[in-house]
Amino acid sequence: MAKNLNFFSSGKLLISSEYAVIDGACALALPTKLGQSMKVIYKKEPGIHWIAKDVNGSIWFEDHFQINDFHSNSQTNETTSRVQKILLAASKLNPDFLVNHTGFLVETQLGFSKDWGLGSSSTLVNNVSQWANVNPFYIQKKVFGGSGYDIACAQKDNPIIYQLIEQRPKVEDVAFFPPFHEHLFFVYMNIKQNSRASIQNHYRGISDQERNALNALTKRFLRTKKASEFQALMLAHENIISNLIGLPPVQQTKFSDYEGVVKSLGAWGGDFVLACGPKNSKAYFSEKGYAVCIPYFELIRREN
């Protein structure tokens, strides 16, 4: 019998060029320490027994799929349909990856809350793609759409610059170790945001001038060594995206009295924001009702 398999993919945070990354803007993206693991155990029983566990180890999804067409006898729900689509796309790219095997137990384990928007879908796509030995960018585009930056993060453990050039992903490893990291915090907004819906509802597209401005800001984010300079870049970036999507920056609507700067990450209105301010910022956000406030290097790997 074949050896059991183990896979892991990193979560993601998009620091710059949200929305515009889909139209070729350079984006600074950070893989997170937290991700999703997947264990594949070969079994004699026919079919695929799928178990998904949340960050606490509790089963939040379970189903059985036929191995030839991934049909499920249970009542189809959104998660069943998503897993089926991922497996179907993988099998089309590599029809042999399940051949000569009777059955499997597939067990996934999230390292973060599935409500956080850190990439429960992209990490799953990348793990299945590793199992099937296929291109995860193809599966992501086929099943979910989007720019693919989250797939690039899933494969990495270091910061990247991500860009679509003629719809092909370009991924560049970069150094991003802010000397002022003790002043950086990721704050969960208590709302899971749907990136695809947000793009459809708000994003109007981007001009060459706006794209060039975002590209320049992304490069400056990497170079800056002072918190005050970083804050100025955050504000400039917020203003550009605000004009692109017709929504006010989050600091104006929720954190106007914060002694620092707050920037949206990814789709505006939910998931995480980035705060650059006092070292005791956790107390401020907790008082505002945002209990999840994570210091930068508790979520992002330190570079070697």
Regions found by a protein language model. Give the residues of each.
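C-terminal nucleotide
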Residues: 2-10, 14, 21, 30, ...
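DPxDG-like acidic metal-binding loop motif
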Residues: 115-137
